[in-house]
């Protein structure tokens, strides 16, 4: 039987203390850490940018599952990958060239 992987989101975490929140997820046995990225355009809220992803790396090697809810998504894929995203999820409607965006991932 295949092991189910747990990927808790940090969206409801205390953003003023993300390092501690990441440590809690590590201690709890999270397999991945889900990071919702919102740009205030594609979706109405604003959240985490690449510098935050990069700074969180010092707290864990748990893979970051980064969900990009931003548009145009292709402009930012490389920045998030370079910052430490291990898995990147995009919305097809967030790009005018899905093939190009997938290739960037």
What are the roles of these predicted feature ranges?
Residues 1-89, 93-100, 104:
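Conserved N-terminal beta1-alpha1 strand-loop-helix module at the mouth
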């Amino acid at each position: 039987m295949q092991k189910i992987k747990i990927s808790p989101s940090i969206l409801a975490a205390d953003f003023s203390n993300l390092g501690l929140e990441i440590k809690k997820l590590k201690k709890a046995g999270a397999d991945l850490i889900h990071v919702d990225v919102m740009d205030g355009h594609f979706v109405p809220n604003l959240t985490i940018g690449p510098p935050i992803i990069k700074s969180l790396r010092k707290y864990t090697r748990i893979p970051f599952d980064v969900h990009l809810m931003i548009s145009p998504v292709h402009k930012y894929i490389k920045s998030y990958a370079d910052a430490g995203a291990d898995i990147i999820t995009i919305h097809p409607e967030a790009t005018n060239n899905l093939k190009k965006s997938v290739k960037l991932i």
